[in-house]
Amino acid sequence: MGLAAPRKRTKISHDPNNTNWSRSTSGYGHKIMSSQGWTPGSFLGARNAAHADMFTAASASHIRVVVKDDTLGLGARSKRDPLDEPTGLDAFKGLLGRLNGKSDADLEAEQKKHEDAKIARYAATKWHTVTFISGGLLAQEKLVSLSAQKESPGAQHGSHQNRGGLDMQKSEEDANTSIKDNTLKALREEQVSSVPIAEDTSRSKSKRHRKDEQGKKDKKERKTKKRKHMDEPSPIDSDIPERAILETDLQATVTDSRDTTPPVAKVLSKERRPMGRHLLRGRHIAQKKKALMDDRSLNEIFMVKS
């Protein structure tokens, strides 16, 4: 907007480094923690905890917050190089340390710490490291004394020999009993099987004979039923004279066609017509079939001169 823009007056705060909140002792959180027994510089939690040995000076300091400038999840590592730092930063820090009056030994120790941190970061990015957290000590549930298990070698040898002899005797007895049982079973099976052989053979023969006779009777009955069904007159007796006329016409046409070409198919004298709704249409269907089987009728249908 230039000069026409509204003026905005900004004042420098009295705490540019934002350290008053950490140094103040009148805050609500400081009062509660001090009432519970906490003092500035002490650790949080139980003093006799299992992980108390892992506390360092950083555990008593304030929590450090890192600004999140990406959309990655919590705990995710960015793909950028963790060693991407301004060049010469370590040397500049060492120079500032010398100006502040630090000794060379302190500066070398700090530089070594920085180098170790760089190596650890590089190794963590290249080879994924696994960090373990101590969760207590493992202890055996039952402490078994080894003195009770230890015995003299002579006694052990004697006990092994006795056990070996007992095992041999048991195996021999088991073998003898198994042989006896097998022989008894074989004798019983022979006695039982020798008696009913003749009876079984006679029974099986009689059963087969009965089955054969029943099968023959069933076949005869089926044949008689089929013959009766074929010999029964068709329900349409009024069409007999018309059938005779059509058959005579067909015979004449067939004789004529035999001279010219061989017959396509044989015409059955007895044709079974369907029952039901096709009863009235049976005549027309039969005439169409007969016309299609004759060459002259086909020529007449297609208006071809013979």
Swiss-Prot record:
One of its GO terms (molecular function) is nucleic acid binding. Residues 15-27 have a biased composition (Polar residues). It is found in: Nucleus, Nucleolus. Residues 1-11, 219-228 have a biased composition (Basic residues). Its main location: nucleus. InterPro entries: G_patch_dom, PINX1. One of its GO terms (cellular component) is nucleolus. Residues 182-191 have a biased composition (Basic and acidic residues). GO terms for biological process: rRNA processing. Residues 1-27, 148-241 are annotated as: Disordered. Keywords: Nucleus, Ribosome biogenesis, rRNA processing. It comes from the Eukaryota. Residues 25-79 form the G-patch domain. Involved in rRNA-processing at A0, A1 and A2 sites and negatively regulates telomerase. Belongs to the PINX1 family. This is Protein pxr1. It comes from Aspergillus oryzae (strain ATCC 42149 / RIB 40).
